[in-house]
């Protein structure tokens, strides 16, 4: 009955263990970008378990997490770069420097805004979600912009703020998905 879901779950776990942890994590600074797929699978698996199929909505949730992952982890890596360097994990700020990581984080923040408002424009959500998403994304982009323009002394402050807000962002964006379905405005 749940063969597809079991396959998705097993694939996600295998991807995380073998592709991300064994192969990517210590070999490339692209580890977070590619490995982000493993962290983005749970909504697809959960949706499939409840509904029995995979539709556009869980794929949008997948995309939100997938695009959210790089700026979230690069922000952490920017203020923990010494620790990542000591244990030989080639995070983007360690390999290519903070400036490159700041630029990439800002670009991903802009893409995240586009991806996260897309559900409204393709008819999956209503105005509650749209306005909430725009508000949350404006804060995410603000912190990312402040980090992008921070000097050496401010870097850790804004990297930490972006990292912490990104956690709240993901929780709230999904909460507003739910509230939007409840209130359907």
Predicted region positions:
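Helix-coil boundary and interhelical linker segments in multi-pass alpha-helical membrane proteins
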Residues: 3-7, 42-65, 115-129, 177-185
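Transmembrane alpha-helical segments that form the membrane-embedded catalytic/substrate-channel core
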Residues: 14-21, 63-81, 113, 136-147
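Helical transmembrane-bundle signal
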Residues: 43, 65-69, 109-112, 116-119, ...
